Structures are given as C-alpha cells and as structure tokens.
Amino acid sequence: EHIKGPGKGSTRGPAGCTIMCTPLLEAQEKLAHGITFYNPSQQRRYHLASAMFVDDNSTYTNKFLRWLNCAVDHTEVIEHLRHDAQVWERLLWTSGGLLKLQKCLYYVVHWQFDLEGRATLTPSSELLPHIQLSSGNSGNYNTISQYDCHLAHRTLGAWLSPSLCMKEALRRLTIIANLFARRIVTSSLTRWEAWMAYFSVFFLQMKYTFPISHHSSTSLRRLQSPAVRATLVKIGFSRNTPLAVIYGPIDFGGIAFRDLAVEQGIEQLCMIIR
C-alpha cells in the first residue's frame, strides 16, 4: 500500500508540512548559491536561497557585489540556477518526495545596455544553454521550460513577469469581470443578493492581486464598468447613474460601490505599512 501524506485539507497537514520542509529549507540555505542583497552602505545583508508556500517553491540566485563591478556572463547565472534547482530536487528525492519537472520553469533576468545607457531585458532566445535537471534515480535529464521576461506566469493566483508588464494580468481580470457581468444580467438574484454578489464575489476577485499590481486608473475603470453597470440594473438603479453617486458614501446619498483605481492604491499602501 502506498504511503500517503495527510493531505492539504487536514488539520495536521500544516504541522506535518512544517516538520518535513524546515530541515530541507535549512539544507537548501547551506548548499545553494541563493540570492543576496545589501543596503547602499553594505552594512546590512539579506540572503535567501528559496521561498516556499505549501508545495510551491521558488529559488533565486545572484552574486550581488561581484556583479556590480564586472560584466555578468549569463551562462554563469544559468549554471548557478541549475545547481540550486538540482540541489532542491535532490533534497526532495532523498526525503521521499519528487519534483515534477514538467511543471518547473525559470526566468533569467539579464540586462543589456545601449550606448546611451538605456537598459533592456535580454530575450530568452539569446540566453543559452537551457537548464536540464535529473529526476530521482532514473538517470534521465529533463529540459526545463525557460520563460521570456515579458511572459507572465501565474504565481498563487497573480500573473506576474520580471518585466513588470501587466497586460496578461489585466486580460485575466477582464475575463473574470465580464463573466461576472454576464452572470449577474442573466441571473434571478434579488436586489440584496446582487448587492452581496458585488462585494463578496466581484470586488474580492478584483482586489486580490492589487497589492502587487500597478494597473493604470483608466484600465481599472474600464475593467469595472460592465460589472458595475450590470449590478446597478439588478439593484434597481439606472446603468447610467452618475459616477459620483455610484462611488459616493451612503451617508451622502451614494451607493458606496468601490472604485478599483482607488482600491488598488489602498491595497498597495496597506502592504507597505504591513
């Protein structure tokens, strides 16, 4: 019979995961190159080999001080990253786990500067060789997918890329917002239920990634328009109600809907304070 873990939904799952993963992460800190940062005076140092959330793990690598003062060979970056990833695979394997290499990917953030000093990210097609990792005791090597720095990847629900481009994230939010609007229009919800759906479903879906997003105000107001107009009709208002009334406080005769452009700023500020 196969030995199975406690499962993600069990009450003992978090404790079991902590007991298993803590020594693995401590070993990763000692064996991997990791990533290091310093403050401008170089009096404070921060080092991290990997960041983990449940069963999702991200590893990072750099040689901060040395690469500040000399040209960086991207092949060295790739080799350090390959080494750190293989270390994590070995740790998982020896502890009874398995890294699913088909789901792994990596970015190489390598800057190029023109004669005017303008920086651009090197395309992934120029960043060779590709990383290959072994899995378990099979002796076989798998090529890991390399993503271009402008290509977003979903991380814990947020679509992010090293270039900080938000096009894919906005596109995904637009799909969710338009789907909500269609469902509200075609539903048989009461006014109270439509009101609750706006705040408990749509609003929470939209603001989840706001602490780490930087969408323009114009984009966010265009994004929220279909859902807001559909909800207004369901709760008995005109879809062309003035914005001052839609987003105004109830104490002053407003409907108290939330402007996503304002909420993004609030969420970012709260994250900084925390």
Give, region by region, the residue ranges found by the protein language model.
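Conserved pre-motif C helix in the palm subdomain of viral-like polymerases
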Residues: 2-37, 80-81, 165, 192-196, ...
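Mobile genetic element proteins and their domesticated derivatives, centered on retroelements
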Residues: 9, 21-24, 55, 92, ...
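Active-site palm subdomain of RNA-directed nucleic acid polymerases
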Residues: 17-70
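A glycine-rich phosphate-binding loop feature that marks nucleotide/adenosyl-phosphate handling sites
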Residues: 42-43, 101-112, 220-228, 242-251
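Inter-domain linker/hinge segments that demarcate the starts of reverse transcriptase
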Residues: 71-96, 175-179
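Short, conserved micro-motifs composed of acidic
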Residues: 98-151
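Basic, alpha-helical interaction scaffolds
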Residues: 133-217, 235, 266-274
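Extended C-terminal regions of large enzymes
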Residues: 223, 236-274
